[in-house]
């Protein structure tokens, strides 16, 4: 979540360009204006992604069709048939077809410190709808007459196969990969830190994510990734996933 800015409300205004990054993953960029993205294809995450021999996988929209892409060794964006895309012309989608989104509130010690709030002893879990996620370089609408639209740099963990009643030690075997996200919160509407309501966290396109899904076997230690937030090119937050207060879950 929020990293590296002590006791400061991390807000954005209309037109701000917000960039969140995680070393070894890549960037997600967001503009605070409205956007709309169609979807015409539903890949199977357990089969489609397992068959791809690439470190990073993403999804883009080409001629109104969802197309899977990979990143080449020299950083180019390429389709499965070898077409190399110009990144400035790409319309990015979230790197995977969205299923259930589980979120942990106040899951970083720095985030709790920024908000002058004691980190909880147990995870605060809430769900987000599919409508909340939007791709790299897309746009997010800032509601009118609000003061506290907070950016929240996140490491997103992508589960690659069905799991139920597994132990914490087994959990890593179900992780397909990782990506980076900006989980906006409209704190003007917050009634209770323990129960963020729909207007705070479940707005359309309020969570830019991607562009790349980095395979789990490419990340030696996901609890030692550097996270950075930049507003209009200026670094405003910096920290690591070591500050994650809940590194395992049952």
Q: Can you annotate each of these PLM segments?
A:
Residues 19-25, 119-136, 151:
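Structural signature of FAD isoalloxazine-binding scaffolds in flavoprotein oxidoreductases
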Residues 39-123, 217-220, 228:
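N-terminal non-catalytic cap/leader segment that marks the start of a structured domain
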Residues 153-155:
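Ligand-binding beta-strand-loop-alpha-helix segment within the catalytic cores
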């Amino acid at each position: 979540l929020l990293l590296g800015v002590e006791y400061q409300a991390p807000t954005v205004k209309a037109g701000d360009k917000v960039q969140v990054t995680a070393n070894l993953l890549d960037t997600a960029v967001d503009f605070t204006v409205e956007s709309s993205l169609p979807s015409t294809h539903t890949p199977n995450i357990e089969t489609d992604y397992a068959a791809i021999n690439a470190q990073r996988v993403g999804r883009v929209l080409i001629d109104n069709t969802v197309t899977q892409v990979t990143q080449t060794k020299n950083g180019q964006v390429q389709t499965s048939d070898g077409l190399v895309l110009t990144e400035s012309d790409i319309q990015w989608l979230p790197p995977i077809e969205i299923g259930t989104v589980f979120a942990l509130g106040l899951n970083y010690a720095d985030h709790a410190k920024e908000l002058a709030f004691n980190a909880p002893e147990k995870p605060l879990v809430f769900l987000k709808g599919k409508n909340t996620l939007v791709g790299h370089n897309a746009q997010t609408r800032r509601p009118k007459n609000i003061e506290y639209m907070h950016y929240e740099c996140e490491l997103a963990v992508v589960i690659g196969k069905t799991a139920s009643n597994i132990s914490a030690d087994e959990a890593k075997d179900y992780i397909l990969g990782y990506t980076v996200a900006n989980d906006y919160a409209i704190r003007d509407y917050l009634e209770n830190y323990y129960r963020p309501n729909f207007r705070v966290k479940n707005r359309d396109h309020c969570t830019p994510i991607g562009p790349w899904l980095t395979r789990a076997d490419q990340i030696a230690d996901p609890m030692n990734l550097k996270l950075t937030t930049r507003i209009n090119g200026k670094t405003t937050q910096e920290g690591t996933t070591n500050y994650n207060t809940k590194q395992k879950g049952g």
